[in-house]
Amino acid sequence: MFLKQPGGCILLQFLGLLGLVGAVTRTYYIGIVEEYWNYVPQGKDVITGKSFSEDKLATLFLERGPNRIGGIYKKAVYRHFTDGSYSTEIPKPPWLGFLGPILRAEVGDVIVIHLMNFASRPFSLHPHGVFYDKDSEGALYPDGTSGRNKEDDMVPPGKNYTYVWPVREEYAPAPADANCLTWVYHSHIDAPKDICSGLIGPLLVCKEGVLNRYSGMRTDVDREFVIMFTLVDENQSWYLDDNIKQFCTNPNSVDKSDAVFQRSNKMHALNGFLFGNMPEPEMCVGESVSWHLFGMGNEIDIHSIYFYGNTFITRGHRADVVNLFPATFLTTEMIVENPGKWMITCQVSDHLQAGMLGQYSVGNCRGNAPHPKVQGQQRRYFIAAEKVLWDYGPQGYDKFTGFPLNTSGSDSAVYFTQADNRIGGKYWKARYTEYVDATFSRRKMPSDSEAHLGILGPVIKAEVGDILLVTFANKADKVYSILPHGVFYDKASDAAPNVDGFLKPGAHVKPGETFTYRWTVPESVSPTDEDPPCLTYLYFSAVQPIKDTSAGLVGPLLVCKKGTLNADGTQKGIDKEFYLLFTVFDENFSSYLDENIKKFTWHPFSVDKEDKEFVKSNRMHAVNGYMYGSQPGLSMCKKDRVSWHLIGMGTDTDMHGVYFQGNTIHLRGTHRDSLALFPHMATTAYMQPDHSGIFKVFCSTLPHFTRGMGQIYEISSCGNRDPSEPPYGMLRTFFIAAEEVEWDYAPNKNWEFEKQHLDAGGERHGDIFMNHTENWIGSQYRKVVYREYTNGEFVEIKARPPQEEHLQLLGPMIHAEVGDSILIIFKNKASRPYSIAAQGVEDSNNGKLLNVPVTKPGEIKTYRWNVPKRSGPGPSDPNCIPWVYFSTANFVKDTYSGLMGPLITCREGVLNEKGRRSDVDYEFALLFLVFNENESWYLDDNIKKYLNKDPRDFKHTDDFEESNKMHAINGKIFGNLPGLIMTEDSMTNWYLLGIGSEVDIHTIHYHAESFLFKIDKSYREDVYDLFPGTFQTIELFADHPGTWLLHCHVSDHIHAGMETTYTVLRNIDNRIPYSTKTPSGAGSHAVTVPSQEQPGKEELYFFGKNLRPRGAKAALVILFILGLLLLVATVVLALRLRSSRRQMAYREVQSCALPTDAL
């Protein structure tokens, strides 16, 4: 009866409000179980329909033998149960494979995980993308915690643990992000081994209102799918010995260090399936589909994921390929329009042939789906495949050195020397050639603007609404095809080689045959509003895609917004268009290899095609098929509006940092001078050069330039005079010296000891890098570094303040604003020539010299860099953006020897009078680089000093060379980087710097915090992908006190020590000085933050929860509002009760007898 009263209704409303204030708690019961997993349950290659016995490479992975495990492995996996009895498992979609269940939550929710470990060894559960306290981090590392805050790090066999993860607003998808962000959870005792053992699953964090409150499923899309692309390295699994014993027919014959055995255990999988064996995700035409994609793994886990048949939008941009790396998480959104069975593949050559393929099925669930309407222009192309004799160096000499390409001892001689068992620089190749009509009797003569295309096929262009009719004549001697990215085509024009129940004559065009492909450009493949006017794609032959593209069959394709193209096909508002393909043409994979050996080697029968040096000589590091500056046609005028269309192709070593010397490019609202390219990825960038001269464009991945992947572009004044001296404002002067030091990568060795102590079953991966033995140098090396001095006397080194302690090996952090000029007084105090040059800024010798002048030992030289507007942040950039400065005397050796530093350019008004930023509380610059000491100038010195041996007689074994590859952050390994300390509720900017070789793929993960990074808009992440030649500012609001792990998520890099900690101090504890409290096993920089079991006196409790100052304010506001509502409810209830009593008294008076006696 009470609840029917008005006061009761108000109380119900009050309780409802309490329910709104409290978050939805999403509870999961997860069990870790051991099981046997079959990577190919259908027992055949589903893509081709063939038996594995017909594929030599497939048998390597899948066939059992005396020393081969085969396709079935014991693994540990996460499983979802109904309740705490763990007796009833909740089934999951079959396409999810061995991944754990999909966990979902909205911003404001709380995720509670009850984890039960049914496995035979300890494991844990660590999330990305959500908030957690120390007792729910689920990650084992020396962080100075103990007791309850350490119990979460590992759950022993037969035990359980409860993790609590609030999904706070700070982890919410940014406005420009998809409605649900893709994250993962995984075991984190030894993360690489745990993940390879199978313990990983998806976690989706959604904006408020996206999930159904009762079912927990999404309401904003029709379908959602999750796919993990990774090379599952079963050699790293905790169960390797079990698998050898169980599945090898002669376990005693197994050599676990054998390279072929190890390769046989590397499974190139989608959710744990190979060769199309993944159960097909199914959807209907017209449905909205969200694809949640992520990568995991090692240095070779570079994945270019291609969705055949349909395009999608990711981070506001149209594409049909996305790149994934270890711990890269992406959400792509697709409106499905093309019915049929379509492939999902990794287009990295090695991964494609090793089985990283799947399929998805699109049905006509509502009857026959009409083709998307197109009413634009019909554009016709007549393209032939022809066999050609190609010269990678047609001018015969290196444009950068002036020496002949076959000069003995030169870098180029490896590729251009013809000999008994060497082909040299000329090869038979295949090439797409354009003809004028369908008779294919007369080639279309290329214009001057197309002279740079080289081996590339003709540029195909179309606007939205157009129809492309491409008549293909195979005038070569192999079966070929044309398969395009980025356009719409039905099965009649499908050139993909998969068996899907359709006759596809365009997939196999034999020599002498022709076929006409019909491609359309409907609105569904149009560039988005965020995209440039023209999207860059490529087309290629897909009969045997690795052989065909290695032979040369590739060309550029542009999809443009309506009204973008002139009548002659050129782009409106663009004066020059250039198309550059960066790839290592691996002639060893070309279908013409045997013919090239026969024609060009002097003794063909002596050639061993497996010989490492022979194989190396055929890997041609080219731009459009040209090497060492031999590409013609890269010329333009000053002030020209230039569009660069950049394309990648190849294998897992084809990670290219394309660098434009002397100018910057405009890329999605940002200013850069370099960008990263990967196989089958293409990018459009813009440039407006402001100085005439000659400049380099090259791949800054360290070995690639020395191997020939560099060209020269020329800018002529064309009547536009260079300003004699631009009106630059403040002159910022720095006194910098190059000097030699004895450097210790790991002065404190406790990190690895402590990790092994915490995990008694763990391995010591750091010994080879830190131990000084008879044949290992250890952690100390002679190096050369940049150091700042107080004045031009170069006597007193300028002391670094505490906020720069983290720079360590790096040179000083140089700041400048747009409009400034930087004057470097440089003294070479080292023993060999060096220089100092910078990316992003304008050198005083800009365009006059290809190479920066060097400074000899003992000399002093002056270098001047100007900061024009194009060198500062772009419209979408943060207030300050990073570049690097370095020595160019010998870029590769100088870098590995230690010469590198950060240069920060800012918008006007950002720097204070001391040259420091006034808009943030802290800034940190981090260089992630595998310092290859084998390439250092000082290797011989280090052998002499630390091994006491003669370098001429010392044998360089594989182990010795591996021991000299220091996986460092600012020159420190295994938790030795100090100075990453900040206070709670502070705004921090981190400048992430990528330099190095093909192994320098770095995915930087911040535990406990997320951050925003900007391209055209801001996006939320907790891992950032970093590559050679790329630099990025990330914005991190530090609001979670504690000492947290910061590391590269690449498996080998974790084991090699590329990890450290950063500390967020509570506001009440910011009086604690740097480097004062050291947890056991950590480096001297670690700071212990008071445990939440002993909170500070200024904290506030709300329903038993310890809150920090900002949270306390919010809690007080909520308490005030609730108190006010309770007061109102109480008053209303009291008034209602009082009114009820009066009515009751009145009724009693009415029913009593009147006092008639008184009458």
UniProtKB/Swiss-Prot annotation:
Gene from which this protein is expressed: Hephl1
Origin species: Mus musculus
GO cellular component: membrane
Disulfide linkage: 180-206, 284-365, 534-560, 637-718, 880-906
EC annotation from Swiss-Prot or TrEMBL: 1.16.3.1
Names of required cofactors: Cu cation
Binding site residues for Cu cation 2: 128, 186, 1049
Entry keywords, A to Z: Copper, Copper transport, Disulfide bond, Glycoprotein, Ion transport, Membrane, Metal-binding, Oxidoreductase, Repeat, Signal, Transmembrane, Transmembrane helix, Transport
Annotated positions binding Cu cation 4: 303, 346, 351
Protein name as it appears in the record: Ferroxidase HEPHL1
Record Pfam families: Cu-oxidase_2 (PF07731), Cu-oxidase_3 (PF07732)
Binding locations of Cu cation 3: 188, 1007, 1047
Gene Ontology MF: a single term: ferroxidase activity
Binding site for Cu cation 6: 1002, 1048, 1053, 1058
Domain Plastocyanin-like intervals: 24-206, 217-365, 378-560, 570-718, 730-906, 914-1092
Disruption phenotype: HEPHL1 knockdown mice exhibit short and curled whiskers.
Keyword match Transmembrane: yes
PANTHER family: FERROXIDASE HEPHL1 (PTHR11709:SF233), MULTI-COPPER OXIDASE (PTHR11709)
Disease: Defects in HEPHL1 are the cause of the curly whiskers phenotype (cw). Curly whiskers mice carry a recessive mutation that alters splicing and causes omission of exon 11 from the mature transcript. The cw phenotype is characterized by kinky, brittle vibrissae.
Task of the protein: Is a copper-binding glycoprotein with ferroxidase activity. It oxidizes Fe(2+) to Fe(3+) without releasing radical oxygen species. May be involved in the regulation of intracellular iron content.
Cofactor stoichiometry and binding remark: Binds 6 Cu cations per monomer.
Annotated family: Belongs to the multicopper oxidase family.
Annotated localization: Membrane
Positions with a binding annotation for Cu cation 1: 126, 1005
Binding-site positions, Cu cation 5: 656, 699, 704, 709
Residues glycosylated per entry: 160, 235, 406, 588, 771, 934
